Every structure is written in C-alpha cells, then in structure tokens.
C-alpha cells in the first residue's frame, strides 16, 4: 500500500511536510498508530508561526497596529523604547505570550508588578490597538502578536531594520511577579548574561545583538547609580567608565536625588535606531554595568567591534535575533484574550 500525504503551507503552515509511506497491506490495528503519528505531525505544523497567519482572517492587522503605534510615538517619543523593552521582557519569561500585560488580582501579583517591570510603560498603546482590532476582527488577533508586531514597527520607524513578523502566538493565562527574577539585570556580568540567555536557547551573539536594542533606551538613576559612588573598596567609581562620563552622570544623579525622573539615555542618538550604542561602549560610556561589561570580555567584545564597523551587519543580526526571540513559545493551551489585561 502506498500512502501519500501532503500538508500545504496555505494558509496556516510555514512549511510543506510530505510523508511517504511504502508498505505492504497492514491490518487495522497496525494502521491506527500511523494515523495517530500523522495527527501529531499535523498538530505541530499547525502550531508554527508564520508571516501570513492573518491574511484571511484579519488582513488589516498590520495597518491598524502600525497606525496606532505611530500615533502614540508622535505624542510620546519614549514609546518606541518602551514597546521594544516590553517585547523583550514578555518573551524572556514564559515565552512570547503577553503575560506581561495581565493585571494583578487580589490573589496574584502579575509580572508587570515585579521589580524589573515596574518601570515598563506604554501598555495603553497595546490596549488601543487591541480595541481597534476587536472592532475590525473580533476574537482573532492575540495580544502577544500585537506586542511582536508593535516591536517591529517601532524599530523600523526609528530608522532600524524592518522584518516581517511571524504570527500565530496565543496569549498565556499565567503571570507571576516572582518569575521576573529570571530577567537579566543591569548589574549582571557577562557570564551571568550568557547563562541567562542560554537557558532560553539564545546564543552569545543573540545576547550582544539584542543588547543593541538599548540604542532606543533611557534609564533612571536607580539602575546605574551603584557604579557612581562607593563602587568597591578600591574605586569610588566603576573604573570601566569613562571619567568625564562618570562625572556627568553624578551631576544628573546627585545624592540625595529628589528628581525621580532623572536619568540618562543609553546612547547619544536615543531616538534613532543605529549602532551608536556599541560606539559608546568602546568609549567607556555604557550606562549599565551589564552593557559596559560586553567590551571587557573576549566572548562578547568582538561582536561589539564588528557592529561598530558595520551597521548593516548589526541590522541583519538584530533582525535574526528578534525573530529568534519572537519564536520563544508560551503555553500550548493559550487563548486569544478579548482584553489584554485579563484572561478570558
């Protein structure tokens, strides 16, 4: 008996899987396991992300999200950096499942209220996009996909690369503040960063590349002031910092500091997505200890130097790493939330 099966990539499969079985006639009890195997393969294929996921069910999804993000960014220039950070923090914990959007309840403290996420902002942008999508395509587009598409939009509109976002994520039903301890900290050294990224299947190259997202970033003093005073028994200021840069930061972050909005942009072209972040690191002007440590370790420095020399290389690698980050999957039992802040 010849059994031929073909699973097409249209409309919901990223790749074509062809299974050809050549066998003699089999009794029914031997055919059932084969059918079961094929059903499993079919299910896995169906779960794959792909660029055309909403082509039939919500063809205007990209337009609605991009218009919403652009409008918000014009009103508040910090939106691009906030959306990009939101995407990273969401994917890094439970996979890209929009768990960062869920509000805390009387019985559960959610991710957004965990210490590293207290400063994550601009959730309203995702809320607005979701509301518009529910009117246009009810119960169709996941909040997780909205974050992913928004992240691509903010990079492109800031002068960075554009990539066609793979879609089809589901929204998770679990969000715990305690899980945020797994996020990389601005005080982490290279070994800690490498270990943290490796747990999520991300390489050293992904680490250095995704750190380049800080080209749009801003930090409040609390995340780096430990580098400015009483750094160690030998040095008052972190010796890896440029001396003049350290003095400038001390002025912006005095002790005591009564300005809770005080801080520093993470590179000198904060509204433009470029390779200036890496140039600042080579000049000793990395704001976070974790950032500056990338040039002090042979495992990461050569990536920094390569991106300084070739911005197009950085853009290419950033696109690849963002797609890889976006493929970190959440729960297989997810849903499409009607409201991004609460489970259905």
PLM ranges: what are they?
Residues 19-344:
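Catalytic cores of secreted/periplasmic or lumenal enzymes
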Residues 1-22:
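Intrinsically disordered, low-complexity basic segments at termini and long loops, enriched
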